[in-house]
């Protein structure tokens, strides 16, 4: 019902990421999650070329290959979750906007939610609003700034509680079905993080040098092309001035910057020889979205105002279903 494609996921890294990825691998082993961890430049290169013979990325010293991960279609997956929720007894009201939270007399607990279509009384409220979490945080009169404890025990000055980051994503106009590994399987989702020098495949200019950069790509049968993206960039506006709507592809304000096309296509050529010159197949179209993040970029899953549980995470995808499951148990 979710149309998930378990093609696998590969986290491919330089030495700076090795320790963190090794820890992730050991955590996966503890819970029985099927993955392989390859260490050392020579073994990594051999492993990748056995899968993708034209692999040529330099400076790679570890590969975490998650066998059961993958990707799926955004809209169809959401409709699938809707069916599962309704089958479990949930009632979903679409096109409704929450406008205010009403607190009980003499208590900080929320007793009702005012919406564009009436008031809904509640004994427990769960807020899982993605980039709109800022709005509910304000409704709950929670602090707009925080002080962060540093490693030396001192605290920073007041830092805004919320800020936004914008995704940079794009696609190549190619037939995704034509891409297969040496084993005849679909490509896994490929994610690379490295500080190796990245040179423009189009101009020869240096894009990244002596700094960490990353991106991902995958042949996507739902988008009919190769889809991918790179690290999000900071939105410089204060959170309360950011226009979240219209969101995603409908937004004119938050779109990939001009330099993204060159970085994305050059990074693909950095990884695989066959993508040399692939900038000619880059789709000129709108893409992306924005995420709301905390000062340390870590998510918040916690109880507030006695009976309000907030899931504040800029991530997305199937892993959030796992978060929802854990929150429902709690």
Describe the role of every protein-language-model region.
Residues 99-102, 302:
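Conserved positions in beta-strands of structured domains
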Residues 66, 115, 219-221, 302-305:
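Active-site beta-strand termini and strand-to-loop segments that position acidic
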Residues 63-84, 129-132, 259, 263-267, ...:
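Mid-domain beta-loop-alpha active-site segment that forms a flexible
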Residues 2-11, 43-89, 94, 110-112, ...:
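Helix-loop-beta segment of a Rossmann-like dinucleotide-binding subdomain
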Residues 101-255, 276-278:
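Flavin-dependent oxidoreductases
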Residues 1-51, 214:
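Dinucleotide-binding Rossmann-like beta1-alpha1 core, especially the glycine-rich loop
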Residues 234, 238-243, 252-330:
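C-terminal catalytic lobe of FAD-dependent flavoproteins
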Residues 36-38, 91-93, 281-285:
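General small-molecule cofactor/ligand-binding pocket signal
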């Amino acid at each position: 019902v979710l149309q998930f494609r378990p093609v696998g996921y590969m986290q491919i890294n330089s030495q700076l990421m090795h320790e963190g990825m090794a820890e992730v691998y050991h955590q996966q082993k503890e819970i029985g999650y099927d993955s392989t961890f390859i260490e050392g430049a020579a073994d990594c290169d051999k492993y990748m070329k056995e899968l993708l013979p034209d692999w040529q990325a330099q400076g790679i010293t570890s590969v975490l290959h998650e066998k059961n991960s993958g990707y799926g279609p955004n809209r169809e997956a959401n409709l699938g979750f809707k069916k599962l929720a309704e089958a479990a007894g949930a009632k979903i009201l679409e096109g409704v906007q929450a406008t205010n939270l009403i607190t009980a007399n003499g208590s900080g607990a929320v007793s009702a939610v005012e919406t564009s279509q009436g008031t809904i009384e509640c004994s427990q409220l769960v807020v899982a609003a993605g980039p709109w979490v800022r709005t509910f945080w304000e409704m709950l009169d929670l602090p707009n700034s925080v002080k962060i404890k540093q490693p030396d025990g001192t605290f920073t000055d007041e830092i805004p509680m919320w800020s936004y980051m914008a995704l940079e994503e794009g696609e190549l106009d190619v037939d995704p079905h034509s891409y297969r590994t040496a084993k005849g399987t679909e490509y896994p989702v490929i994610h690379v993080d490295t500080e190796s020098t990245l040179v423009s495949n189009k101009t020869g200019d240096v894009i990244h040098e002596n700094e960490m950069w990353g991106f991902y790509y995958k042949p996507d049968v739902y988008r009919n092309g190769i889809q991918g993206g790179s690290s999000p960039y900071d939105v410089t506006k204060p959170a309360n001035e950011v226009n979240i709507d219209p969101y995603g592809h409908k937004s004119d304000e938050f779109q990939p910057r001009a330099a993204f096309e060159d970085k994305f296509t050059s990074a693909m050529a950095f990884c695989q020889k066959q993508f040399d010159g692939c900038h000619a197949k880059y789709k000129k179209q709108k893409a992306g979205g924005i995420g709301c993040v905390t000062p340390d970029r870590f998510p918040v899953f916690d109880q507030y105002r006695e009976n309000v549980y907030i899931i504040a995470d800029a991530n997305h995808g199937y892993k959030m279903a796992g978060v929802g499951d854990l929150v429902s148990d709690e």
